[in-house]
Regions:
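Start-transfer (signal-anchor) and selected internal transmembrane alpha helices
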Residues: 1-31, 223-229, 313-328
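Membrane-interface coil-to-helix junctions
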Residues: 17-113, 142-143, 152, 267-271
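Membrane-interface helix-loop junctions at the exits of transmembrane helices
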Residues: 22-26, 133-135, 141-151, 235-245, ...
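Periplasmic/ER-lumenal interhelical loops and adjacent helix-loop junctions
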Residues: 40-41, 235-307
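Membrane-interface micro-motifs in multi-pass membrane enzymes
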Residues: 77-82, 101-111, 138-166, 191-195, ...
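Membrane-embedded helix bundles of polyisoprenyl
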Residues: 108, 112-124, 131-172, 178-211, ...
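Perimembrane helix-loop-helix junctions
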Residues: 198-229, 306-316
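Signature aromatic-anchored transmembrane alpha helix within multi-pass, membrane-resident enzymes
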Residues: 226-230, 329, 379, 385-413
């Protein structure tokens, strides 16, 4: 029976995948949706990491992309490129040659395993095969699943949660603790995405605690857990997760991506997509969107009914599975975080020590850790459904599935349309449209001299496609200290008038560019490159290209290079203009700006001249000019 359930569930998952996404993503030579983006830009990051790793020389540990975070390299785990899959498929891809993307096949396997383990889990509580397979539709059409697949590709492996729950309940029924299934899941999870680790280990810990206290045996469960930790650490080390010091990534800390208290009945997905035909959109704040956990109308209706039907059994369930309940409570509290939000309001922000905030920020997208509880709530509806007998059970399971799929189908339809569109046109087209970038293909290294560059993911793809290395911090984690040290050394070289002929220097901030460019302006093409719409800018030092003329998107650094206000905003300033008087503007201090202002009597902007009254440089790094306006 288990074999039939798993096979039937897997086929159901494959069917749902094909109906929603078709088969075009299964063409490994079709990477259009990887390059152009799908729903968000993240898949561009995943694919860029794979491209860098594929062209990296063999070494140990595995999965180190030598061209990222150059010169140290970085594990593709931190570009969410599914390191275990990348390691297995790199030899295959290099043998086949040409374009090779695995995002489609990986996601298909995720759907198959979601269906397979979902059917097994349902089969633990529902008799026969028909009712569990009907109930399995809840798992293979899960809104949380569809919110992640192809968008955050590795997080589509939510079968890890279903499989962990299945192995937990199966082991409990057998009175065992040494579940081989849980052991394997805990090891493999680190090779797919680290966020699955606290989920699968929480379920494992619950099993071990319940067994240890019930049987008064600590040694066996303790050794099992130690061996499991060792296996996980070994695979993590093998795949490069412990390589270097990848500790920084983004400004958002624990509490920003918290779960809103309305998450279970809020059908709003990313980009405002509604996963419900009935329920309206609810407000959210901060990064609540990443904690999306809409249950679906079928489950929301069936869940309170199940609670009523099981009211006499719930106490016994909680006593039998006390450790699982405790682990779920901890995961829920962690998901909600210290920033408690409801609809569009922040109810409270509980103070936590900075050390705890830093520790918890390892899993800063805390709302994801609610997934085990999310799927347990679905499972609880099936336990309540099991109170029905015979044909009523099958009818109830079918009705639940029909209502659920009918309700959440708008979200699936939109995701289907988005994939079809992504195959035809770029959802996020490149901003690197200038002919400068064709000339820049000659370099072997792209160095980011400050911050993260505009259109960073297309820049990463550009570097990977042309066999370049880059230090631009586009990955989810990187070594912030090492990057700062490297940038200081490069700036010192430029200050000494030295450029590396094989290196393209990029600045995100004009002020930093103007500070660095003077000593090397005769040895490189220097200037500003923009996108067609002007939303993206790169300030470049391109050795060997001096004297060349590029298109209108390029402004060379020469005597005609224009002054620009500093793009600075705080409580007093608004994009370089002092709010209080609207008469004082600021510029980032540099030799170029001082030279321009030295004997100037007026500033000209948009064809109008404004008399300069005073120039103030008392604030280090800034030149403040008061105009007669």
């Amino acid at each position: 029976r288990n074999g039939r359930l798993f096979l039937g569930g897997a086929l159901l998952g494959v069917l749902v995948f094909v109906l929603v996404f078709g088969v075009s993503t299964l063409d490994v030579t079709n990477d259009a949706f990887c390059r152009g983006g799908y729903i968000e830009k993240d898949i561009q990051q995943h694919y860029a990491g794979w491209l860098f790793y594929r062209q990296s020389s063999a070494g140990w540990p595995l999965c180190i992309a030598r061209g990222i975070n150059y010169p140290d390299g970085l594990s593709v785990a931190y570009t969410d490129s599914i390191p275990l899959v990348a390691a297995l498929l790199k030899p295959v891809a290099n043998l086949v040659g040409g374009t090779f993307q695995y995002m489609g096949w990986f996601t298909l396997v995720c759907f198959a395993l979601q269906g397979g383990f979902g059917a097994l889990l349902a089969g633990l509580f529902l008799p026969g095969c028909a009712a569990p397979l009907a109930a399995d539709l809840l798992f293979v059409t899960s809104p949380v699943l569809f919110e992640r697949v192809f968008r955050h590709t590795s997080l589509g492996a939510q079968f890890f949660v279903l499989a962990a729950l299945y192995f937990y309940f199966a082991a409990r029924r057998k009175g065992q603790y040494a579940s081989r299934g849980l052991f394997v899941l805990n090891v493999l999870a680190v090779g797919i995405h680290p966020y699955f680790l606290p989920m699968t280990y929480a379920i494992t810990l619950a099993l071990l605690l319940e067994y240890a206290l019930h049987n008064r045996q600590l040694a066996g469960p303790g050794l099992y857990l130690a061996a499991n930790f060792s296996g996980t650490a070994l695979l993590g080390w093998t795949l490069g997760l412990l390589y270097g010091s990848a500790s920084s990534g983004g400004q958002a800390l624990y509490g920003y991506f918290c779960m809103n208290l309305n998450a279970l009945w809020n059908p709003v997905g990313v980009n405002g997509v509604l996963y419900s035909r009935v329920l309206p959109a609810q407000n959210q704040v901060y990064g609540n969107y990443d904690a999306f956990a809409y249950l679906g109308l079928g489950v929301l209706i069936a869940l309170p009914i199940a609670v009523v039907l099981l009211r006499r059994q719930l106490g016994g369930m909680l006593r039998r599975h006390w450790a699982l309940a405790c682990c779920c409570a901890v995961l829920t509290v962690f998901a909600i975080s210290n920033v408690i939000t409801a609809n569009g309001a922040t109810l409270a922000t509980l103070p936590l020590p900075a050390s705890l905030i830093k520790l918890f920020s390892i899993f800063r997208s805390s709302g994801r850790l609610f997934w085990p509880i999310y799927y347990l709530l679905m499972l609880l509806t099936l336990v309540g459904l099991a109170r029905l007998k015979g044909r009523w059970l099958l009818a109830g399971a079918a009705l639940l599935a029909v209502v659920q799929v009918w309700d959440v189908s708008p979200g699936m339809v939109q995701r289907s349309a988005a994939m079809q569109q992504a195959m035809q046109t770029d959802a996020f087209p490149t901003e690197m449209e200038s002919d400068f970038w064709q000339a820049a293909q000659q370099y072997t290294a792209v160095v980011s001299m400050d911050e993260i560059q505009d259109d960073a993911l297309h820049l990463a793809l550009f570097a990977a496609d042309n066999g370049m290395t880059t230090n631009d911090p586009f990955a989810a984690r990187y070594d912030e200290t090492a990057l700062a040290t490297q940038r200081e050394a490069l700036l010192a070289e430029l200050a000494a008038g030295t450029v590396r002929e094989d290196t393209l220097y990029l600045f995100a901030e004009e002020g930093a560019f103007l500070q660095a460019v003077e000593p090397v302006k005769d040895n490189a093409w220097c200037g500003r490159v923009t996108s067609t719409d002007g939303t993206c800018s790169w300030y470049v030092i391109a050795p060997g290209l001096q004297g060349q003329n590029f298109d209108a998107l390029c402004t060379p650094y020469d005597e005609n290079y224009p002054l620009r206000l500093a793009d600075y905003t705080d409580a007093l300033w608004n994009r370089g203009v002092l709010d209080e008087t609207k008469q004082t503007v600021c510029f980032a201090d540099s030799p170029f700006v001082r030279r321009k202002l030295e004997h100037a009597s007026v500033l000209c902007a948009d064809g109008k001249e404004y008399t300069i009254k005073t120039i103030d440089d008392h604030d280090a790094g800034w030149l403040m000019v008061t105009l007669d306006i």
